[in-house]
Each structure stands twice: as structure tokens, then as C-alpha cells.
Amino acid sequence: MQDRHVGRRPLGPRRPWQLRLLLALACAAAFVSPIEATRAADYPSRPVRLFVPYGAGGVGDLTMRLLARKLSEQVKQQFVIENRPGAGGILAMTEVLRAGADGYALGEVGNGQAISASLFNKLPFDVLRDFTPVSVAAFFEMLLAVPGNSPFRSLKDIVEAAKRSPGKLNLGAINPGSTQNLSAHLFQQVTGADFALVTYRTTPELLTAMLRGEIDLAFDYYAGLISEIDSGKMRILATSGEERNPLLKDVPTAKDAGFPQYVVVGWNGIAAPAATAPDVVKVLNAEINRALAAPDLQEQARRLGLDARGTTPQEMRDRLSADIAKWRGVIEKAGIPKQ
């Protein structure tokens, strides 16, 4: 039976121009690969800008400064922190995209951006589509604290009191739309307790209000509260993590205290524009994980209540996706209007 070639001419001898074209393509392929390899091998060959969507001194800023310092030592190029606070991280991440996808502009991404994805009506970017995750840098939990002279000795005590007298106890947190604020909403949702939620602009304002006796329970991170806790002016009823904090071994988690659905783990990591070369992302991931494993960085992070621990890019993407879904549910259930 005769072979038939539908829509295709039988193969025949190569014409000279075809041979020249194939040779040119082969040379081009051989030429591109070393350039890409060299770019990854030489990266970084100049300072790297790391955009942080928070002001100086907060947990997000402190995490990135620890990491940037160690990365600068390792690769012999400066990782320069550029703080761009405001607008739920929009300003910082827009700067990253504007700077280009060459690996020399990176952004801090974490639970804050997961919240922004559901809190804002329209963002100038999609954090999952327009960025490629590199690695998580640190995890951190919330502390649920009361004044040092509070009559409440356990989380169960204060929840039961809030149920007996709805709206009578004040629950303090910072910034509407912040992880702390939404964690307070989630706490009421999973416990059924009815607190009056009082919002403050900054952690120092929150602390001042608590020390004045204006609020009965506060939600914030370890780094923000620990000095007042060490002085005895505040007392921790529980932490929000999966496991007990090694610095606070006598303090139960909310799960231990009888509220297994209340788990909040904040985190911050690094992302690059989506078009960044995979080899550059691979180099960054390896260097970040090496930096985070350094004993001196581990000790510095531990003193700030941070669990400094790297991940793969896919693990960071999975966590970001899960947190977007989690906080969207909290926002919708709380009836928080989109901005």
C-alpha cells in the first residue's frame, strides 16, 4: 500500500538555504545557553533592591533586615532594604514590577499580601500570577495578651466572660485589614465570643491603651509585646501557633487551651517578578535557605520570636494560595467592606 502524506510534502534532500538556516539555528541555541548559565552563575553581580511593604522596626522589616545582612555577607553584594509602606503592600510590589524581571528587584510577600488579595476591590497586579515565589524567610505567631493585673487567668476564662456579657469586654488590635485585626475577627468567629473590637494605628498605641486599662485582651506579635511581658505589665494567655513557642514553653497554644480551630501563623518571604529566569530563582532560593540556616541568624531571629526557616518556591506558593482562601473567608464572614 502506498504511503500517503496528508498536508505534508515527502522528505527530500536539503536545499543549501535550508542547511544554512539549520546551522544558524543550531549556533544560536549554542550561543544562548552559555549566556543564560553565565547570568545565573554570576548572579548577583551588583546590589539587589529588596522592597519591604512595611515601615522600619516592624516584624516584616526586621525579618528582611536580618536576611539581607546575611545574604550580603554570603554573595559579596549588597541586598538593600527599601521600605515602601502603605496601601496593603501595593506600593512596594508595584515598584518591584516596575524595576524589571532581572533578579535585582525583589519584594517581601507574606500573609499581608494574602489578605490584600481579598481586601481590595482592584489591585494593579495578581500576586500569584505576576510574581514567582522564591522562599519563605520566617514564620511567627500571634500572642493573646492581657494586662498584668487582669482577673482572667486563661483563654477559656476570658472567652466565657465575653459570652456571658456580649460586647462588654474590649479586644484590641492594630490597623483594620492587618493580620492582627483579622486574627481578632477569626478568634470571635471560632470561639463564638462577642468582644468589642477596638482598633489602633500602631502597636505602641495598643500597648498604651492596654496599660491604661482600656482594653481587656490584645492581639499582636511577639516582637511588639515582649518588652511589656518581660516587665510583668502584660501577661500571655495563649499563642496562636500550631505548636508551643520554644521561648514561651509554659504558655499554651489556643489549640491547647481548647480552641483547635484557632491557628494563625504569620509569615514573610521573598518573591520576584514572574518573568524572572528560573536559574536566577534557583540561585536565590539556595542562598536564602543557606542564610536562614546560619547559626548567628537563627539566634537573632529567635530573640525576636521568629522561626527563621526557608522553603521551596512551590511550598511558598502553596502557603500563599491557602492563606488567600483562609483570609477571604474571614473577611466575608466578618462583613468587612472591600477597599
Which ranges hold each PLM region?
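N-terminal (or domain-start) structured segment
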Residues: R39-R129, K168, Q189-L217, E228, ...
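A ligand-binding cleft/hinge motif common to bilobed small-molecule-binding domains
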Residues: G112-K122, N181, Q188-V190, L217-V251
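An extracytoplasmic/periplasmic, membrane-proximal ligand-sensing/linker region
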Residues: S45-P47, V190, D256, P278-Q339
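Short beta-strand and adjacent tight-turn residues that come in two discontinuous sequence segments
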Residues: E108-V109, V136, Y200, F219-D220, ...
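N-terminal secretory signal peptides that target proteins for export/translocation
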Residues: M1-P16
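Hinge/capping helix and adjacent helix->loop/strand transition within the periplasmic-binding protein
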Residues: R98-Y104, S118-E205, A254, W267-Q300
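Bacterial N-terminal signal peptides
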Residues: R20-S33
